[in-house]
Amino acid sequence: MKIYRRPFKKFISMYTLKPIVVILALFLLMTIGNLKGFLVFLVIELCVLSFIVACTATQLFYVVLTENSLIVQNPAYRFWYAEFQFNTIEKIEIGYKGGLSRPYIQVMTPAKKSWRYVTDLVDERDYPDLIQTLREKGFTVETPGLHHILNKHENL
């Protein structure tokens, strides 16, 4: 079994969350003199942060390769995973839309296409190994837009 996953604290979306938390904390500190305003803003801030964290957690997927299946798992929402048996996979797409998006994986089976799972917990340095391993197992792996990431880590 091979797991393609980086530590939870190193996911790329964390860099987006840090400034938001700092800005909200500064706004909260400005309201300390007024208890009623402080409590109201605290409730609003907690609601906003809860929403942002819940949305960010939908991007936290990593990939597990077992002897006869490919598993895409989300550690934040443990119920949210997909397991694909190797004998049912027709094609795998590991792509990158560019800009502020994150790489994704999509598996095509005879029955249907899977969702595009944003693999923010897969380290960029692991993509060449993941793609090579999948191709060695005989799968067609398409990598639209991923050449930027693959070329960046080619000489490491």
Segments and roles (model prediction):
Residues 1-35, 112-115, 156:
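N-terminal membrane-targeting/pre-transmembrane regions
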Residues 72-132, 145-155:
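Non-transmembrane, membrane-adjacent beta-strand/coil modules in membrane-associated proteins
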Residues 138-139:
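Helical coiled-coil signaling stalks immediately cytosolic to transmembrane anchors
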Residues 43-47, 86-89:
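Short Pro/Gly-enriched beta-strand edge/turn motifs at strand-loop
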Residues 50-83:
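Conserved beta-hairpin
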Residues 36-43:
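Short, aromatic-rich membrane-interface segments at the entry and exit
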